[in-house]
Amino acid sequence: MKITKLETIWIDEQFNTLWLRIHTDEGLIGLGETYYVPRAVAAVIHDVFANLLLGREVFDIENHWNNMFSTVNFFGFAGAEMRAISTVDVALWDLLGQYLGQPIYNLLGGRNRDRIRIYNTCVSHGPHQDYHAWMEGRAGQLAEELLATGIRAMKIWPWDQFGVSLGGPIGRRAGVG
């Protein structure tokens, strides 16, 4: 199965999220995603990685990763280049899972637990408008809303004024910190 097209998608409602759809000659489409500065990541995918991927075998996942990494590793181990590699990697694993009729976790060694706890990251997705609540100093209100939906943990940004937005130890004692 060959890679025929790399399609990047971002929408105004989630302005920092990028989705990648990798199309194949057999009609399967793999989906990958990343967060932050989507146009920069899309540029790396289209301007740098397209030549490494288009027309190539989908299932050479490790080889694709190594080729992408060796092409951009002089930029370091972070930034748009690494997010682009990750996005492509996820989409390729998605394609392999679809082709084999298996969830990706089976391909990566199998399930090791039946349930996992989830947490919320303040990035304005869904009904909570998390990022805006955090920026406007309403993190405590956001935490209460999340608790009401069963989400018991929230990741806040390291530069957040924790003592102000959640009331520090007082907020924790109140069940929202």
Regions found by a protein language model. Name each.
Residues 8-11, 109, 123:
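Residues that form or immediately flank small-molecule/cofactor binding pockets and catalytic motifs
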Residues 1, 86, 114, 149:
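Structured loop/turn residues at beta-strand edges in well-structured enzyme cores
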Residues 1-31, 35:
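Structured beta-strand/loop patches that form or line metal/cofactor-binding pockets in enzymes
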Residues 108-115:
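Flexible hinge/switch segments at interdomain interfaces of large molecular machines
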